[in-house]
Curated annotation (Swiss-Prot):
Matching PANTHER family: RIBOSOMAL PROTEIN S15, BACTERIAL AND ORGANELLAR (PTHR23321), SMALL RIBOSOMAL SUBUNIT PROTEIN US15M (PTHR23321:SF26)
Source species: Sorangium cellulosum (strain So ce56)
Quaternary organization: Part of the 30S ribosomal subunit. Forms a bridge to the 50S subunit in the 70S ribosome, contacting the 23S rRNA.
InterPro entries documented for this protein: Ribosomal_uS15, Ribosomal_uS15_bac-type, uS15_NS1_RNA-bd_sf
Pfam family, one: Ribosomal_S15
GO biological process: translation
Keywords: Ribonucleoprotein, Ribosomal protein, RNA-binding, rRNA-binding
HAMAP family: Ribosomal_uS15_B (MF_01343_B)
Name this protein carries in UniProt: Small ribosomal subunit protein uS15
Amino acid sequence: MLHSVQKTDIIQKYAIHDGDTGSPEVQIALLSERINQLQEHFRTHQKDHHSRRGLLKLVSQRRRQLDYLKRVDIERYRSLINRLNLRK
């Protein structure tokens, strides 16, 4: 779970303009951070299958957001992929 300080930092880092919390870049960055935290959780709790389902939901949600951004603006998509160090 993201703490409010972490969430605020991510929002400020990826926001397009002041007060931006809903742009695809911000949403994808927040989802990526939650996914990374869950991956750390699974390093010590391999048998936590309930949380694994939540992880799969987050990954598919991020995939849909990335597909949308790629369809709308390919340059923003490529920039975000590089900034987040995602494979693509």
